[in-house]
């Protein structure tokens, strides 16, 4: 199963927790973990490889600097935040599907059913906030997002991606232009 994580060095501790929870809660799976990272040292990659030994392989990916030359960045909108949106550009062409997991989540169930979700021609599948979490996030989103509707909002921390479709449809410049044009409402990635 193909897993994508994106990070900089600040997210190494939570990534270790997330990967540990993924491996513990899905004991029957083997994972190909593609990691797009900024500023990681060789010993960082070695520690991640050791953590996943026997159950998964870490594939460190380099980021072409020129791809992000026009990317607007801010405190919460770092270069690393864009990596998931441009996954199809950064991952090997041999991959057609990947499950993106934020480094700061906990995996509490097997992820195979999620990974195998029928996307019905859509580029991605994502979850909305529900239950107790919606009671926390909805008021914040009403303040920061014009015309906020809970049903139209999704959590970008867990995404099933159709990479083949994304390669046909997603253009980096369009993403950067949108981020630049909507910086006032795009507070959190």
Where are these regions (language model features)?
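Active-site-proximal specificity loops/subdomain of glycosyltransferases
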Residues: 43-90
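A conserved hydrophobic helix/loop-capping motif in glycosyltransferases and polysaccharide synthases
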Residues: 3-9
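Short aromatic/hydrophobic "clamp" motif used to bind/position activated sugar donors
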Residues: 98
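Conserved donor-nucleotide/metal-binding helix-loop-beta segment in metal-dependent transferases, i.e.
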Residues: 105-139
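Catalytic metal- and UDP-sugar-binding loop of GT-A-like glycosyltransferases, i.e.
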Residues: 101
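Short internal beta-strands
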Residues: 31-39, 126-127
């Amino acid at each position: 199963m193909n897993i994508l994580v994106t990070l900089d060095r600040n997210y190494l501790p939570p990534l270790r927790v997330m990967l540990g929870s993924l491996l513990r809660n899905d004991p029957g799976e083997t994972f190909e973990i593609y990691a797009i990272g900024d500023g990681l040292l060789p010993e960082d990659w070695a520690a991640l490889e050791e953590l996943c030994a026997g159950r998964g392989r870490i594939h460190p990916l380099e980021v072409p600097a020129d791809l992000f030359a026009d990317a607007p960045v801010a405190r919460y909108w770092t270069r690393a935040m864009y990596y998931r949106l441009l996954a199809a550009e950064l991952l090997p062409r041999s991959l057609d599907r990947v499950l993106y997991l934020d480094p700061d989540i906990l995996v509490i169930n097997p992820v195979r059913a999620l990974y195998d979700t029928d996307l019905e021609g859509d580029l991605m599948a994502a979850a909305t906030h529900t239950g107790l979490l919606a009671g926390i996030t909805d008021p914040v989103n009403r303040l920061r997002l014009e015309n906020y509707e809970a049903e139209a909002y999704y959590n970008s921390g867990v995404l099933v991606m159709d990479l083949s479709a994304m390669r046909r449809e997603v253009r980096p410049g369009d993403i950067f232009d949108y981020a630049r044009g909507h910086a006032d409402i795009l507070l959190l990635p």
